Every structure is written in C-alpha cells, then in structure tokens.
Regions:
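Core segments of cupin and vicinal oxygen chelate
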Residues: 11-60
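Vicinal oxygen chelate
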Residues: 13-18, 73-126
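Short glycine-/small-residue motifs
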Residues: 51, 126-129
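Residues that flank catalytic or metal-binding motifs in active/ligand-binding sites
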Residues: 5, 40, 48-50, 74-76, ...
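Conserved catalytic-core motifs of GNAT/GCN5-like acyltransferases
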Residues: 29-36, 103-108, 131-135
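A short, acidic/glycine-rich surface segment
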Residues: 39, 60-66, 102-103, 109-112
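Short secondary-structure boundary/capping segments
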Residues: 1, 43-44, 68-70, 108-109
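N-terminal beta-strand motif that seeds the catalytic metal site of vicinal oxygen chelate
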Residues: 1-18, 26, 76-78, 133-135
Length: 135
C-alpha cells in the first residue's frame, strides 16, 4: 500500500461566492457537495479526480468544523497543469481580467521542466499555471 496522489486541498477565503466566480472565469467547474448532517461544501473541480475545497474564514466557528487550526487567507501557493499553450494561458488571464505576477518562465514541476505563469486569486493565494512541452 502507498499514497497514490492528491485528492483535494483547501483554500480559505473572505467571500466564497466571489472566489468561486473567479475560478469559474478561469474555466474550472464549480460544484456544491451535499453532505448529510453537515453544511454543503463549495468545491472547485480539477479534472476527473481532484478538487479544491473552499472554506470561508469564519467557518472554524461552525459546530462540527474540521479543518486547519489556524486558517489564513492568502496562505496557499499551488500549481495547476494547463493542457494548452502558454499563449493560451496568457489570453485566458487577459480575458478574465487577471494580471500575471511572474512569467512566462521556465520552472521544474512534478513531471519535469515546464513553462509557468503565476498570478494571485482574489484572496492573494499564489496560483501557478504550468505548461509541459509536447512529447
């Protein structure tokens, strides 16, 4: 037995609706998971088997909350793989009103060398979109 991969991670935000709209404009699917006996969970779906759960900063005050002991806004830094080209990444960001912070620049990601563009989401989390070279 071994760890297989990442199922999900959490970002902590000020305004759930605003954050979900931001990621929707970037082409990600938004879903609300209905959990019996617990509040619904907003999620940002990534492909078939990964997601980002979205927690509001005040959720630790809710009964039954299970999450970070000291959640913080803007504390996330993550990389998402883009299936298109770097110019397409730049066009998507421009069309979405997002200003790149760094890039395009060469980086080493999980599968090796890639080209990345970095930007901030509405809560100041650092988001990296990376493009691997064609084989």
């Amino acid at each position: 037995m071994a760890i297989k991969g990442i199922d999900h991670w959490v970002i902590v935000v000020r305004d759930v609706a605003h954050t979900l709209e931001f990621y929707r404009r970037l082409g990600l699917a938004i879903a609300w998971e209905h959990r019996p006996g617990r509040p619904d969970m907003p999620t940002i779906r990534i492909g078939d088997g990964q997601k980002i759960n979205v927690h509001a900063i005040d959720w630790p005050d809710r009964p039954g909350y299970l999450g970070a002991r000291r959640p913080s806004i803007g504390g996330a830094d993550f990389c998402l793989e883009w299936t298109g080209t770097v110019p397409e990444v730049l066009h998507l960001l421009e069309r979405s009103g997002v200003t790149p912070e760094v890039g395009p620049s060469t980086r080493t990601c999980a599968r090796g060398p890639s080209t990345s563009v970095y930007f901030r989401d509405p809560d100041d989390n650092l988001v990296e979109l990376t493009v691997y070279p064609e084989p």
